[in-house]
């Protein structure tokens, strides 16, 4: 695929994740997909792993938006710098819903093979997120 196609695929991940689009995941997340994320205490592998990740995040947050700030692509890699803006509407990391509108920065690097995402490195500002919902002192 071209750099443009790879970029379009990586950017399409965010609305699909926000909308919990299982059809998109099955079509565009490789069976051997792996998400490398030091902030998670469980493995995210293949479409089933994305489903589990969505359950965890959507269980704690609603009204999620992913404003894209920057995109850089080279060969089979696409780096997306974005914000995750959401309402803390359910339990997350043991903290009950606060109704707080959260806003954190995220860096996602994707590796593409063909028309599928095969690898994902994610860095989220989890400390800032936990501060915003009152789970840790500011």
Give the location of each predicted region.
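C-terminal and inter-domain tail/linker signature
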Residues: 1-138
